[in-house]
Amino acid sequence: APGTLTELAGESKLNSKFVRDEDERPKVAYNEFSDEIPVISLAGIDDVDGKRGEICREIVEACENWGIFQVVDHGVDTSLVADMTRLARDFFALPPEEKLRFDMSGGKKGGFIVSSHLQGEAVQDWREIVTYFSYPVRNRDYSRWPDKPQGWAKVTEEYSEKLMGLACKLLEVLSEAMGLEKESLTNACVDMDQKIVVNYYPKCPQPDLTLGLKRHTDPGTITLLLQDQVGGLQATRDDGNTWITVQPVEGAFVVNLGDHGHFLSNGRFKNADHQAVVNSNSSRLSIATFQNPAPEATVYPLKVREGEKAIMEEPITFAEMYKRKMGRDLELARLKKLAKEEHNHKEAAKPLDQILA
């Protein structure tokens, strides 16, 4: 079997392991863009008297409505963003054996994966990824960072640092919005983890049957996503009834709030419900930077507003929260698979005239 997806991209029919059930298939095209997700300029965010209040209001409104927004004028240098994107594309263009040198299977911390790093997935995602842990710095395992293309480690280090700064700045705004000290959300993460996932979605022969990344919410605090101009990121705020495709904005970061951010705000801020779709015209690249709390950090609302109840019964660690989330996901997948098998079994047992009726 081919070791990478890039090799399957040229086939005319989609391999059955990527085919999703009908209820999970894309409802909206990858390039049918919506401008419902706000694009917010951060120019002047540090002027305490000036623009800061207005920017804070826009961010809070976006978090209450969607849990997702885009930021421009964010202070991350455009040439750094261009370098990071170029190196990522160059990596995925390498021959399969070069990419597979960094194969992550067998419990390695970081590296190259086809489809997904989760065990027990019934249907595969149409993507290749390279992932590594960048914070805390002591957790960096440079042997798992690609050594090709040249310059990857140096550019990634700078990119990681700049995005850590941007994430903390956004968390300060959300802390203030909750009526807390501005360091509150960052402190709640204890020693903030950062994981970078570079997603590559090759051209797909039958994109209407599959997903690049299945529907989910991110488990962590906040995610900063850099995407190219192709389009494919989709979001829903009514539990999947209607989906919109996020309009790519040159040089912007898409900001998603995760489950941890949702719980800390006592549900006031939404955890973005999203997925990625693919297409048959061109490949797509996105770079997700996940800002997560330390595994031992406590997950519990930082503030419960008057007249409200806490949305969690008890404080738990982030490690436990993550474990429960994965357990639920696998259980849902298992039940779905069972129901499907049962349905197929019943269909097979029907007499032919009934099936054709």
From Swiss-Prot:
Stated name of the protein: Naringenin,2-oxoglutarate 3-dioxygenase
Pathway: Secondary metabolite biosynthesis; flavonoid biosynthesis
Family note: Belongs to the iron/ascorbate-dependent oxidoreductase family.
Residues that hold 2-oxoglutarate according to the record: R284
Fe2OG dioxygenase domain: residues covered: 189-293
Enzyme Commission number: 1.14.11.9
Swiss-Prot/TrEMBL catalytic activity: a (2S)-flavan-4-one + 2-oxoglutarate + O2 = a (2R,3R)-dihydroflavonol + succinate + CO2
Cofactor list: Fe(2+); L-ascorbate
Gene name as annotated: FHT
Any one GO biological process: flavonoid biosynthetic process
Species assigned in the record: Matthiola incana
Purpose of the protein: Catalyzes the 3-beta-hydroxylation of 2S-flavanones to 2R,3R-dihydroflavonols which are intermediates in the biosynthesis of flavonols, anthocyanidins, catechins and proanthocyanidins in plants.
InterPro entries the record matches: DIOX_N, IPNS-like_FE2OG_OXY, IPNS-like_sf, Oxoglu/Fe-dep_dioxygenase_dom, Plant_2OG-oxidoreductases
Keyword tags: Dioxygenase, Flavonoid biosynthesis, Iron, Metal-binding, Oxidoreductase, Vitamin C
